[in-house]
A protein has these predicted regions:
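A glycine/threonine-rich phosphate-anchoring loop and its flanking beta-alpha core
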Residues: 20, 118-211
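Single conserved hydrophobic/aromatic residue that forms the stacking wall/gate
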Residues: 1-11
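A short, small-residue-rich loop immediately preceding and capping a beta-strand
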Residues: 92-115, 119-130
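Active-site segments that bind and position negatively charged phosphate/pyrophosphate groups
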Residues: 201-312
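C-terminal charged capping/lid subdomain of soluble metabolic enzymes
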Residues: 302-369
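ATP/NTP phosphate-donor binding region
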Residues: 12-98, 322
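Short glycine/serine/threonine-rich phosphate/pyrophosphate-binding segments
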Residues: 29, 52-56, 107-114, 134-137, ...
């Protein structure tokens, strides 16, 4: 695997590939043959069961008309694990397919990335059905154990060949996914800036750092309205903008930045919170990252940013306290021990310690929100 703790193509030769996408309503799937024709005429489709039920009625007629043969439709299994990726990759229908479709949210799409790596970078296309992460346009896969503990980050050597974004499907999804997706996306701006601080920048990282502001400012201005519109299933300009911000803008930034520059304290704290089984089960990744961003602000002494964001946190309901994620202060040692053990904190302008994180979490508990 081209994982963060092993040598990969990124170590030997920096290659930066930006994602491509089509955006629209159900009509977006009409573009499928245009982008798949270079790769063959057989596909294995892998995704979440709910996601497949939402997307396949719109995808299948296009595939039939184009003469693209579906060799198999496979539920991904509910968690992105190396074991499940290997299991799917060993299926004859998947090995025989010319290319893969990844349908669903981040865990389903990341599972297909693991499958693609197993099959020597088999081409894959993404069809996100929730706007909760940039998984559909990025090279990174967040991999977990079967019991839902964070296991590591794996990289494919390129982003998906193409991403088909159907906003008509996305607006029908529960609003909590966009809500969490925006929380995850805001952190991209601040985490890349912090990771890259005091380091010599090349063109790609400069581009990524400039673009990263588009991961935060549009959400500050339009995020609450988009969330409200999503709650009533109204596809508005604000909703479409947030979909593109979460799925695509963040993917571009990820593609520009070296892997270790893409996350730091916010994600590390998220993984610490997720060590609690009930928290991981009942709270979304982006929700916990949003909380972790507040801890980043405190640790990094960005109190002006903390105060700038707290009002929208209150309005939109992102967590500001441990209790909102089913935790209390007795769990702080577990959170911070996990946080400092992950690769996310390795590239930092200064050493991140357990004491530093614990103090910031306790300080956040004292703030009236």
């Amino acid at each position: 695997y081209t994982a963060l703790n092993t040598l990969s193509l990124h170590d030997a030769l920096p290659i930066y590939c930006l994602p491509s996408y089509s955006f629209g309503g159900h009509d977006v799937f009409g573009a499928i043959p245009q982008f798949t024709k270079l790769y063959g005429h057989t596909v294995a489709i892998i995704g979440g069961e709910t996601a497949l039920s939402k997307a396949m009625p719109h995808i299948q007629p296009v595939l039939d008309k184009a003469g693209i043969n579906v060799l198999d439709v496979i539920p991904f299994g509910g968690e992105c694990t190396f074991a499940r990726g290997k299991e799917i990759a060993a299926m004859d229908s998947v090995k025989d397919a010319d290319f893969l479709f990844a349908v669903g949210g981040g865990k389903a799409i990341d599972t297909v990335k693991v499958v693609a790596v197993e099959l020597d970078d088999k081409p894959f296309f993404t069809i996100p059905t929730i706007a909760s992460t940039c998984a559909a346009t990025s090279e990174a896969a967040a991999v977990y154990t079967a019991d839902h503990n964070f296991d590591g980050i794996a990289f494919v050597n390129h982003p998906p060949v193409h991403c088909f974004i159907d906003a008509d499907i996305l607006v029908e999804a529960p609003s909590r996914y966009l809500w969490a997706g925006m929380g995850d996306t805001i952190a991209k701006h601040y985490e890349t800036l912090m990771s890259a601080r005091n380091r010599e920048q090349v063109y790609n990282t400069q581009l990524g750092l400039v673009l990263s502001s588009m991961c935060s400012e549009p959400i500050l201005e339009h995020g609450l309205q988009a969330y409200k519109d999503n709650e009533i299933k109204h596809r508005s300009e604000a909703f479409d903008l947030m979909v593109m911000t979460v799925i695509f803008t963040t993917g571009i930034v990820s593609g520009c930045m070296p892997g270790d520059y893409n996350s730091i304290i916010a994600h590390a704290v998220c993984y610490g919170c997720a060590t609690n089984e009930e928290t991981e089960k009942h709270h979304l990744h982006g929700e916990m990252v949003a909380y972790g961003l507040l801890i980043l602000f405190i640790v990094d002494k960005q109190l002006d940013e903390l105060n700038r964001w707290l009002p929208i946190y209150r309005e939109i309901g992102w967590p500001t306290k441990l209790s909102q994620m089913g935790l209390d202060e007795s769990y702080i040692p577990q959170i911070v021990e996990k946080a400092v053990s992950v690769r996310d904190v390795v590239v930092s302008p200064y050493e991140i310690t357990t004491d530093m994180l614990a103090e910031a979490i306790r300080y956040m508990e004292t703030i009236e929100c």
